[in-house]
């Protein structure tokens, strides 16, 4: 199974979304290379970056699931390799 390296950028504007977001990320933890979270207190949002190495369909499914959460925005950027 071919994999791709990607960075999934997430902006959380609804603090109630953090529990379902963490549960979703836990489901895909075997694909996660690393994670960085930045609380931006002045704007009351959280910025999260997830580095993954996974098949394209797994990345798309994860990103789609994250985007369905209320108050959460996400985008993925892929490596060309």
Region spans (language model):
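Long, contiguous binding/interaction regions
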Residues: 1-81
